[in-house]
Amino acid sequence: MNIKRAKEEIEHTVKAYLAKDALGEYAIPAIRQRPILLMGPPGIGKTQVMEQAARECGVALVAYTITHHTRQSAVGLPFIRQRNYGGRDVSVTEYTMSEIIASVYAKMEATGLKEGILFIDEINCVSETLAPTMLQFLQCKTFGNQAVPAGWVIVAAGNPPEYNKSVRDFDIVTLDRVRRMDIEPDLPVWKDYARAAHIHSAILSYLELHPQNFYQINADVDGTQFVTARGWEDLSNLLNTYESLGLQADEELIRQYIQHQKIAEDFSAYLDLYYKYRDDYGVEDILAGQAKPAAFARLLQAPFDEKLSLVNLILSGLETRFSASRRADAAADSCYAFLWETKKAFAEMPAELAQEPNCWAQLFDQMTADYEAETQKKRTAGLLDKPTLEARLQTAKTLRSWEKELLRAAAPDADAAFKVLRTQFGTLSDARDTAQQTASAALEAAFDFMEQAFAESQEMVVFVTELTLSPAAHAFIAENGCERYFQYNKDLLLDHRKAALNQELEAEQRRHGML
């Protein structure tokens, strides 16, 4: 099973386990809600899919790496309590609440969400003293004498023994009480995630050429060498930040993330070439509609991997513009909705309050503060993905700048105050239009170059396919259109259908002995 399918299964499980009957009771009793056990190699994305699943299901998430805990923190600390049993006073041992269970209650209190996912990572790598506690947890859904609260779905994750020497096998009794999912690395599935997460285009381009280097764990005389999906993503974040700071990544830096010597050397060499192609071909000039004549001449002699790298560089430049347009669009939409809520609030302000100095700015300040508080609450609950969080933070920043304009204007009435805000929104709307026009012009320039350089070759197929698969590109084109994209995409679909029909025809002829 790949990680995408595992995420879908987790989401379906959460919905099923939290479904209620006509009496308000859970449709599947807690005793029949089997914990999910994810087994897969390290760095494959198990923790990330838990965050995504919780966010998309609208529930809280408490995540623990159990190898960081002792028996005392997992079970609780012992203390002596006096009891009377059968007329005889005795001293008995009880336990404080488990730190993990306490964290669940703390999360419920902080977020207001009463249902969630309790995720325990590296569950089969615990110490000998903690192993019985983990078995009890999976079998009985308790830590010590404290049960996991109702409405919390248990998901655990572990590594197969070939990846971790401290792994402990679960017995059949335990395995018969869980839902085990074995997860394997899958590059095409990861690329779907990578496009949405804006993984550095050099990494995507490199893995397109060398898919075997996506995930490897090799043991030799010098120790274990490895490269994981987590390593590629973390390296991507660093490369993007380095580029924004004007810094250059070298092989020594890359080896800190790609801890496989041959792959680190290979990617480092490719990254140098990638940047060289960007400068030599003038990708920004191409997207500005000013491609250099020398670029076309060089492409005539270029090998396929160089051509593919150039296509990915063009796609990366477009992706930057599509994302900027999306952010500008989201900011304008969010502020527009807030603007009309403000107009309604202005109209409903009591007459006696409307006479006070700066009353409109004060009301706007309170509404903005409420918006910021809502954002923080959702952020604490983990209900905002990165793009949504960035959009809300940018909206709050914009609203604060509008508040300053309101204070400066000292509007005498609601109409005058709203006019100030509407003027500010006009500037925001203009910025949205500019971002959209910039992205559209770059897309047309890219098609001009691709047609002149590659016509309808394999490189054009890659270009159009990647535009189709990119969430940012797909959303932009769906909203703003692009005739040449639609035409090439239609032709590609027809070609695929013809190829599929030819394959079916050949298969039919073979069955009848005609070939």
Model-assigned labels for residue ranges:
Residues 1-212, 217-220:
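AAA+ P-loop NTPase catalytic core and its hallmark functional loops
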Residues 4-7, 15, 20, 46, ...:
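Context-gated lysine
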Residues 196-353:
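Alpha-helical lid/collar subdomain of P-loop NTPases
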Residues 300-515:
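Terminal-proximal interaction/regulatory segments of ATP-powered molecular machines
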